[in-house]
C-alpha cells in the first residue's frame, strides 16, 4: 500500500492513531522513490539509511499529536546543505561534498521531526530552466517523459508530481520553483525575499535567491512554509517579519479582492492557449467575487536582460570560492597554483555555469560596470516601482507562470537565449523581492499549465487565500500523471 495520495493531515492522523509508524511511512516513501526513479530521475542522492534511522528515533519517542509534520518525509534540493548527506549542487565541482552543517531551512524541518529522504536533481548551481545542466542526469517531466521538468528545481517538482514524495524544498532565483511547478502541475511558492533563511543555500544570486516549498495542494504548501520560514541571525538578509500561520486565510472567500492582470503578461511570446487558460482563470476569480482589471507593468519587458546581468555578476563573485583548494573537485593534472585554479574550474564547471561566470565578470569589469551592472540596477528599481504602483490599488497580480507548457528534452539546451526567455514571467518577481506562487490551472496538449499569483511583500497569506479559493472550485490539482496512478 502506498500513502502518496494522502494529504499531510491524513498522514498525521494515521501516525497519531498508530495505524502506521514513521518507519513504515519512510519505507513506503523509499519504495515509491525507487519504483519511479528510473522513469523520472528526480534524485541525486536517496538517504535511505539516515532516513530510516531518524524514523526509528521518532517512533521511539512517539509522534507528537500537536506537530503536524512529525514523521513526514521531505525531499530537499541538492543546493541546500544537509549535514552528513551529499550536497552537490548537481556539479562535478561538488561531486563529493558532504556538509558539516545543516541549512537553517533543513534544521527547521528537523526541529519539527521531518525526515530528509534525499536530495533532488537540479540544474548545475541552479543555473538553468530545464534540469538538463546537471552533471549527474537529466530529470524528466512527470507527465511526459520526453519533456523537461523545468528548472532549476526540476527534481523537487517531479518528485512531488510523480508521487515519490508529498513535500519538497527548492530554491528560486528567477523562477526556479514556479516554472517547474507549472510544468509538473504542482503548487510551488517563492516566498518574499528574506522570509526563509538563505544560510546553507549554495549561493547563486544572493540578492535574488530564496528557498521555498513544493506540494500537491495549496494548504500543504502553506503548511510546509510554516516550518521553514523564520528569522535567522546567520543570514544578514533574513527578514524580521514572521507570520504565525500561513494557512490562516485559507478557506476564506475572496469577495472584494482586487486582482490586477498585466497586459504585458498576455502579450508577445505567450502561447495563445495559455493566454486562454489564464483568461478563463480570471473569469473564475470574478465568479468568486473578486475584481480583475487590466494594468500595465511597462518595465517588465526588460526583466530578462536585467536579471542575467545582475544574477551572472553575483554568480561570478559567489563561485570564486570553488577553486580546488578548500573542498570539492580538484584537477589532478596541475603543476602549479595557477594551473590548479584554471584546470579545476575549467573541468569542474559545466558550460552554462562558465557562460554565466564570464558574463558576470564582463559586467563587473572596470570598463563596463557603469554600462551594464549599474544600469541594470537602475532598471531593476523601475521594475520595483511598477509593482509598487500596482499594489497601491490591487491586492494581487494574476498571470501565467510560463509562456509555454513544458518543452522537449534537448530542444533548448543549446539555445541559451531561448532558454532564458522561458523565465520571462517569473524573473520580475525575484528582481522585486516579492512572493509568487504557481498553481495548476489547466492543460494544453496534455501538459499542465501554471497560473501565477504575485503579491506585495509579506502577502503570502493573501496569495494562499486566493490560490486556495481557485483550487476549491477546480480539479486540476486532483489530476495526476500516469506514473502517479492518474489517467494522463
UniProtKB/Swiss-Prot annotation:
Its EC number is 6.3.5.7. GO terms for biological process: translation. Keywords: ATP-binding, Ligase, Nucleotide-binding, Protein biosynthesis. PROSITE patterns: AMIDASES. It is an enzyme of class 6 (ligase). It catalyses: L-glutamyl-tRNA(Gln) + L-glutamine + ATP + H2O = L-glutaminyl-tRNA(Gln) + L-glutamate + ADP + phosphate + H(+). One of its GO terms (molecular function) is ATP binding. GO terms for cellular component: glutamyl-tRNA(Gln) amidotransferase complex. The keyword Ligase applies. SUPFAM superfamilies: Amidase signature (AS) enzymes (SSF75304). Disulfide bonds: none annotated. The active site is at residues 77, 152, 176. The keyword Transferase does not apply. InterPro entries: Amidase, Amidase_CS, Amidase_dom, AS_sf, GatA. Allows the formation of correctly charged Gln-tRNA(Gln) through the transamidation of misacylated Glu-tRNA(Gln) in organisms which lack glutaminyl-tRNA synthetase. The reaction takes place in the presence of glutamine and ATP through an activated gamma-phospho-Glu-tRNA(Gln). Heterotrimer of A, B and C subunits. Belongs to the amidase family. GatA subfamily. HAMAP family: GatA (MF_00120). NCBIfam families: gatA. This is Glutamyl-tRNA(Gln) amidotransferase subunit A.
Amino acid at each position: 500500500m502506498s500513502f502518496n495520495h494522502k494529504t499531510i493531515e491524513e498522514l498525521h492522523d494515521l501516525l497519531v492513531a498508530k495505524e502506521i509508524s514513521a518507519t513504515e511511512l519512510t519505507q513506503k516513501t523509499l519504495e515509491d522513490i525507487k519504483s519511479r526513479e528510473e522513469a523520472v530521475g528526480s534524485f541525486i542522492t536517496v538517504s535511505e539509511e539516515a532516513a530510516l534511522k531518524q524514523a526509528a528515533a521518532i517512533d521511539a519517542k512517539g509522534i507528537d499529536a500537536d506537530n503536524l509534520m512529525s514523521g513526514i518525509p521531505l525531499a530537499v534540493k541538492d543546493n541546500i546543505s544537509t549535514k552528513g548527506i551529499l550536497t552537490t549542487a548537481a556539479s562535478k565541482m561538488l561531486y563529493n561534498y558532504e556538509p558539516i552543517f545543516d541549512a537553517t531551512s533543513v534544521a527547521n524541518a528537523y526541529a519539527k521531526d521531518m525526515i530528509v529522504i534525499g536530495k533532488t536533481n537540479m540544474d548545475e548551481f541552479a543555473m538553468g530552466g530545464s534540469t538538463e545542466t546537471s552533471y549527474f542526469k537529466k530529470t524528466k517531466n512527470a507527465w511526459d517523459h520526453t519533456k523537461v521538468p523545468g528548472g532549476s528545481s526540476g527534481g523537487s517538482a517531479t518528485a512531488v508530481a510523480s508521487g515519490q514524495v508529498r513535500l519538497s524544498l527548492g530554491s528560486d532565483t528567477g523562477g526556479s520553483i514556479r516554472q517547474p511547478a507549472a510544468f509538473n502541475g504542482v503548487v510551488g511558492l517563492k516566498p518574499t525575499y528574506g522570509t526563509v533563511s538563505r544560510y546553507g543555500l549554495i549561493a547563486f544570486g544572493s540578492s535574488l535567491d530564496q528557498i521555498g516549498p513544493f506540494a500537491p495542494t495549496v494548504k500543504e504548501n502553506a503548511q510546509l512554509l510554516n516550518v521553514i520560514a523564520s528569522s535567522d541571525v546567520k543570514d544578514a538578509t533574513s527578514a524580521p517579519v514572521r507570520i504565525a500561520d500561513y494557512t490562516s486565510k485559507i478557506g476564506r472567500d475572496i469577495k472584494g479582492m482586487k486582482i490586477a492582470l498585466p497586459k504585458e503578461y498576455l502579450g508577445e511570446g505567450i502561447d495563445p492557449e495559455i493566454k486562454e487558460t489564464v483568461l478563463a482563470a480570471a473569469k473564475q476569480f470574478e465568479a468568486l467575487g473578486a475584481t480583475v482589471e487590466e494594468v500595465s507593468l511597462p518595465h517588465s519587458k526588460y526583466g530578462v536582460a536585467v536579471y542575467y546581468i545582475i544574477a551572472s555578476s553575483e554568480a561570478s563573485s559567489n563561485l570564486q570560492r570553488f577553486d580546488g583548494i578548500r573542498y570539492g573537485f580538484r584537477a589532478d593534472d596541475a603543476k602549479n597554483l595557477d594551473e590548479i585554479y584554471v584546470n579545476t574550474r575549467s573541468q569542474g564547471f559545466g558550460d552554462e555555469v562558465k557562460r554565466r561566470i564570464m558574463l558576470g565578470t564582463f559586467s563587473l569589469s572596470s570598463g563596463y560596470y557603469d554600462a551594464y551592472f549599474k544600469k541594470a540596477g537602475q532598471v531593476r528599481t523601475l521594475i520595483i516601482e511598477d509593482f509598487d504602483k500596482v499594489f497601491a490599488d490591487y491586492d494581487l497580480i494574476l498571470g501565467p507562470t510560463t509562456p509555454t507548457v513544458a518543452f522537449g528534452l534537448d530542444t533548448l539546451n543549446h539555445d541559451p537565449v531561448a532558454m532564458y526567455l522561458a523565465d520571462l514571467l517569473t524573473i520580475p518577481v525575484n528582481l522585486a523581492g516579492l512572493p509568487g506562487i504557481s498553481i495548476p490551472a489547466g492543460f494544453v496538449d496534455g501538459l499542465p499549465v501554471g497560473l501565477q499569483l504575485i503579491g506585495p511583500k509579506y502577502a503570502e497569506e493573501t496569495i494562499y487565500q486566493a490560490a486556495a479559493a481557485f483550487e476549491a472550485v477546480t480539479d486540476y490539482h486532483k489530476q495526476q500523471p500516469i506514473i502517479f496512478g492518474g489517467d494522463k
